[in-house]
Amino acid sequence: MFKMFKTKQTKELYAPVTGTTISLEQVPDQVFAQKMMGDGIAFELESNVICAPCDGKIAMVANTLHAVGINADNGAEILIHIGLDTVNLGGKGFTQLVQVGDKVTKGTPMIEVDMDFMKEQNIVLTTPMVITNSADFNFDVEDGEKHVIMGEDKVITFK
C-alpha cells in the first residue's frame, strides 16, 4: 500500500552518447584520469548529441557549453564534460538544448555537438562522465572498452 509514496530512485546510469567506453584512467587529462572530479567512465564520442544518462534535474550548464551537470533522483551529482580543452572554444561548436532547472529523463537530449567543427579544430572528443560526489555512493562501473548506444546501454550501476 505504501509503495505509491516511494520516490523513484536512480539505479543505473546509461550511456549519454554513442561511442566506445574507456576507463577514466585512460583519459589524457590528469584531472579526470586521477579522479579529482570524482569516479566514473569516459567515452570516445561518435554521436553528435549528449543525452541525460538518467532521470534528474539539470543543475549546471557551463557558459562555454562544454559541460553539463545533472542531479540524479538518487542524489548523485553527475558531470558530463564534452571533449578535452573544449572550454577554450567559448561555446562555439555546441548547441544548448536544456536549461538549468529542467527536469530530464534518461535519453533527453541536452547538448548538440558540431562534429565537423570539432574535427576542424582538432578537438579530442573524449567525454568523461563522473559522479562528483562519488564518495557518497557504492557503484560498479562497466570495465573494458565496448561500444555503447546512447540511452540504451548501462554503464554504471548503483548498489
PLM regions: where:
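Contiguous, well-folded functional domains in the mature portion of proteins
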Residues: 1-159
